[in-house]
């Protein structure tokens, strides 16, 4: 019998379950990358909405304006839909506040909507919910760009568009994390989700390149094209997304991976049915250490989360307060608030900062800003690998936050020395800023949302994810707004604000870091059995 072709041998070397998981991994990666792709254009177009005008440019503009009034031909004439140094109403001296308000409108709506999104999403099929969000997001992203073609100069139009877009985009994150959590267990979760979460940076890079291609010639297309891409991916989602392995008769890894230790984020694994069969088994020492309120054997009642169930079906939706009682949710949520403040300030203001400091045009500044996201890809993967190896999520985040603050100070100083220095600091800053943000929004959220007391309840995963990312989105809304208010007084003040935010993020993890470092390893130490009450 002839030997099978190499390609066929490769295909059959993997099981049916593995192929399905790879498909879901890639599909959810592309779906959320398209969300981020649609968020990036506003930061690229800022440099075009208010152009960097030199004294010669302003004199040229006045000369052409006088020629138009006298009826003579002008050697340089601006289009009718542009004014002196940009697009009204962003051509005035208060342009930074107006641009900051656009960011705040989107991000504030996103933060508020995220809390509601988890509650709504856990009661609707993920595929339908996500499809609706992507189609609506594509429509409102494109609507912003239509302001260029229809010569719209109403500030209210752009604000309302941003608000609605922010609300509908909240359908994305809880949905894709829940879907991925259904398909992948806890083994090597930091690495898997670190690689998967690079969709954030990939989406930002693609968004920068696509928006930058048209920003100087027809900035409306910088929004219309990404909007069309998101809508198209929404159709792909509707046609191909599989919410749970059981839907295609695949095994669920959430059931098979039952290792006592998960990651040191203080989770109590309790459920009545499990207690009946395992009540004589000892707790993992680190879990025990994280759950002891005074270190003497007493367990805080608020750390016990027991869901009503029907013998383990895992279909009951956890309440908002119930999710908050899961140890670690509040601390990581508040940490993410400040970590996301830093990340989104760079997302929305970095191209304009490069334009002002290095005096590059909007297209080149947008292309250069992608290096921050390239660094973010490596930072997210590195954080996942380290946290998997050390089995300490909070400590990994804390170390990167500790290094990020002085790096931002160096960035603010070195970036003024030339293009080469800017490139190096963009890569390093991107890695350190995005690492903790990536780890918390993916591996930590999935760990907390699938702790054993919930018995793999995807509804709970959606709620926990929404709480953590929703709290982080409050910081994402504040960061760009504060940057818009502080930047007129000097970019150095913006960087001081970012360094302070990193310090605050680290502060909220101190208790968890102390618990992780003071606990014995997972294979040693005294073990205390937990008795059913």
UniProtKB/Swiss-Prot annotation:
Q: Which GO terms describe its biological process?
A: glucose-6-phosphate transport; phosphate ion transmembrane transport
Chief place of localization: endoplasmic reticulum
InterPro entries for the chain: MFS, MFS_dom, MFS_trans_sf, SLC37A1_2, Sugar_P_transporter
Q: Which GO terms describe its molecular function?
A: glucose 6-phosphate:phosphate antiporter activity
Q: How does it sit in the membrane?
A: Multi-pass membrane protein
User: Membrane-spanning residues where?
Assistant: 18-38, 100-120, 129-149, 157-177, 222-242, 304-324, 334-354, 366-386, 394-414, 423-443, 466-486, 490-510
Localisation per UniProt entry: Endoplasmic reticulum membrane
User: Regulation of activity: what does the record state?
Assistant: Inhibited by vanadate but not by chlorogenic acid.
The answer to whether UniProt assigns keyword Ribosomal protein to this entry is no
Task: Extract the PROSITE patterns matched here.
Answer: MFS
- State which residues carry a glycan (glycosylated): 81, 263
Q: In which tissues is it expressed?
A: Expressed in numerous tissues, with highest expression in pancreas, kidney, bone marrow, spleen, liver, small intestine, as well as in fetal brain, liver and spleen.
Record keyword Endoplasmic reticulum present? yes
Q: Which GO cellular component does the record give, naming just one?
A: endoplasmic reticulum membrane
The protein's annotated catalytic reaction(s) are:
D-glucose 6-phosphate(in) + phosphate(out) = D-glucose 6-phosphate(out) + phosphate(in)
The UniProt entry's coiled-coil ranges are none
UniProt keywords (A-Z) are: Antiport, Endoplasmic reticulum, Glycoprotein, Membrane, Sugar transport, Transmembrane, Transmembrane helix, Transport
Into which family does the record put it?
Belongs to the major facilitator superfamily. Organophosphate:Pi antiporter (OPA) (TC 2.A.1.4) family.
The role this protein plays is: Inorganic phosphate and glucose-6-phosphate antiporter. May transport cytoplasmic glucose-6-phosphate into the lumen of the endoplasmic reticulum and translocate inorganic phosphate into the opposite direction. Independent of a lumenal glucose-6-phosphatase. May not play a role in homeostatic regulation of blood glucose levels.
Record's protein name: Glucose-6-phosphate exchanger SLC37A1
Organism in which the protein naturally occurs: Homo sapiens (Human)
